[in-house]
Amino acid sequence: MGSSSFLVLMVSLTLVTLVAAEGVKGGIEKAGVCPADNVRCFKSDPPQCHTDQDCLGERKCCYLHCGFKCVIPVKKLEEGGNKDEDVSGPCPEPGWEAKSPGSSSTGCPQK
């Protein structure tokens, strides 16, 4: 009887801990969606954020370019986004052009 009570107690404590940790990790999600990430990584960068609440202003915590970073989200059409915005991925670095099919640099700052 004692060992079964102990087992029930341990399982209950484990479940409570997991649920509480998930609530802390999730937080409130900010508007918009993370930009597409088409970069292949050989090694992940250390995370700069864990949730949207770690990011200032409207920035979201997104996996981009091999690690979690605070980035400006892409707006969905129903959130006032522009259908001409480039939602195929991040803006190319200066001096590079988008080469993949269907990609463009529309909506990227011109330098």
From Swiss-Prot:
Leader sequence range is 1-23
**Biological role:** Antibacterial protein. Putative acid-stable proteinase inhibitor.
**Can you list the GO cellular component terms from the UniProt entry?**
extracellular region
Q: What is its main location?
A: secreted
Keywords of this entry: Antibiotic, Antimicrobial, Disulfide bond, Protease inhibitor, Secreted, Serine protease inhibitor, Signal
Q: Kindly list the places in or outside the cell where this protein is found, as annotated in its UniProt entry.
A: Secreted
GO biological process assignments: defense response to bacterium
Q: Which Pfam families match?
A: WAP (PF00095)
What lineage, starting at the top, does this entry show? Eukaryota, Metazoa, Chordata, Craniata, Vertebrata
Q: List, for all copies, the residue spans of the domain called WAP.
A: 27-74
Query: Which terms in the Gene Ontology molecular function aspect does this entry carry?
Result: serine-type endopeptidase inhibitor activity
Name the SUPFAM superfamilies for this protein.
Answer: Elafin-like
**S-S bridge residues:** C34-C62, C41-C66, C49-C61, C55-C70
Q: Where is the composition biased (Polar residues)?
A: 101-111
Q: Where is this region: Disordered?
A: 80-111
Q: What is this protein called?
A: WAP four-disulfide core domain protein 12
